[in-house]
Regions:
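Short hydrophobic/aromatic patch on the recognition helix
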Residues: 42-43, 47, 93-94, 98
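Residues within helix-turn-helix
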Residues: 30, 41, 77-81, 91-92, ...
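Terminal helix-turn-helix DNA-binding modules in bacterial transcription factors
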Residues: 17, 21, 49-89, 111-112
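…primarily DNA-binding HTH/wHTH and HhH modules…
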Residues: 96-112
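Core residues of bacterial helix-turn-helix
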Residues: 36, 43, 86-87
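Short helix/strand-capping hinge loops at secondary-structure junctions
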Residues: 22-27, 54-55, 105-106
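Membrane-proximal linker segments that couple transmembrane helices to downstream signaling/catalytic modules
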Residues: 1-38, 49
Length: 112
C-alpha cells in the first residue's frame, strides 16, 4: 500500500520518492542524506519519527514488494535475477530477507 506522501515533512517525502525510484541501486544512509541535504543521524531519526518505521525497513519493504510483483508476473524468473533487480548482490541473503518478509521462499511464493 502506498504511503500518503502529503502527511510527511518535505524531506521525508523526498526520501520516499527517491527510494521508490532507486530501490534497485545501492542505497546508503549517506547517499540518501546527501540527496536530501540532511545530516545522516537527523535523517534517520526524522524518517523513523515521521513514518513509524526505520529507513532501511522501509527500503527493504519497497524492494520486497517489487520482488513479489516480479515473481508473481513471471513464475519462471530466477531468484538471482530478481535479487539483482531489486538491489541485492547476494541471492542467498535476498532469499532470507524475502522469507522474513513473506513467510515463504521466493520459489514457494511463485507456486502459491
Amino acid at each position: 500500500s502506498k504511503i500518503a506522501l502529503s502527511k510527511f515533512k518535505k524531506e521525508v517525502q523526498a526520501v520516499i520518492i527517491y527510494v521508490n525510484a532507486h530501490y534497485m541501486d545501492k542505497l546508503t544512509l549517506d547517499s540518501i542524506a546527501d540527496y536530501v541535504g540532511l545530516n545522516r543521524e537527523y535523517l534517520s531519526r526524522l524518517f523513523s519519527k515521521e513514518t513509524g518505521i526505520g529507513l532501511f525497513q522501509y527500503i527493504n519493504g519497497v524492494r520486497m514488494k517489487r520482488a513479489g510483483e516480479m515473481i508473481r508476473s513471471n513464475k519462471q524468473v530466477y531468484v538471482k535475477e530478481v535479487a539483482a533487480a531489486v538491489g541485492f548482490d547476494d541471492p542467498y541473503f535476498f532469499s532470507r530477507k524475502f522469507k522474513d518478509f513473506y513467510g515463504k521462499t521466493p520459489s514457494e511464493y511463485a507456486e502459491a
